[in-house]
A protein has these predicted regions:
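Positively charged, amphipathic and often flexible ligand-engagement surfaces
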Residues: 1-167
Length: 167
């Protein structure tokens, strides 16, 4: 893991957690505990995900259970509970940073409320949206003192269109 080599004193490498995968909440908790035990800075980027079709095709090829949550509501629940988990750990003093990459207003509002109510250092929490989408969210977060990023999705048009259909 690159984070083992590079996250010794600051968050350099962020691990992306595709929250549409059933395994992601447990994987995130395990990785956070492992980083903390090793004295590393934990850095995570939470996304809902964009590779569902590929994941399902791979599961069928391997003859394993569908790795995707059964509904969008289950994916939302996994995303929001994992965001709360990381924010809670940060509020408890765990050396962690999280980027919440989402366009979902409810998820953002919940996270901002928790950061505010728990007195979490805003430098440990950042947000990201796709370039050209939901600019009003990005600007409002930035005006509120949060690190807020735009990211460009550079890939074949087929993949980009599939991603946009999920938003």
């Amino acid at each position: 893991m690159l984070s083992l080599a590079h996250n010794r004193s600051s968050p350099v490498v962020y691990t992306t957690y595709q929250m549409y995968l059933k395994q992601s909440p447990q994987r995130l908790e395990t990785d956070l505990a492992r980083a903390s035990q090793k004295g590393l800075v934990f850095a995570a980027k939470l996304v809902r995900g964009a590779y569902m079709q590929h994941e399902r095709e791979e599961a069928v090829k391997r003859g394993v259970e569908d790795p995707i949550w059964p509904s969008i509501d289950a994916t939302h629940a996994a995303y929001d509970s994992s965001a709360r988990y990381v924010l809670q750990k940060i509020s408890e003093g765990v050396d962690a940073h999280v980027m919440l990459a989402t366009h979902n207003q409810d998820s953002i509002s919940q996270a901002v409320a928790m950061v505010t109510s728990e007195g979490i250092d805003q430098r440990r929490v950042s947000f990201g949206q796709l370039y050209g989408m939901k600019d009003y969210i990005t600007f409002a977060l930035g005006s509120g003192g949060f690190q807020s990023y735009k990211y460009a999705y550079i890939r074949l048009m087929y993949f980009v269109l599939n991603l946009l259909l999920l938003l």
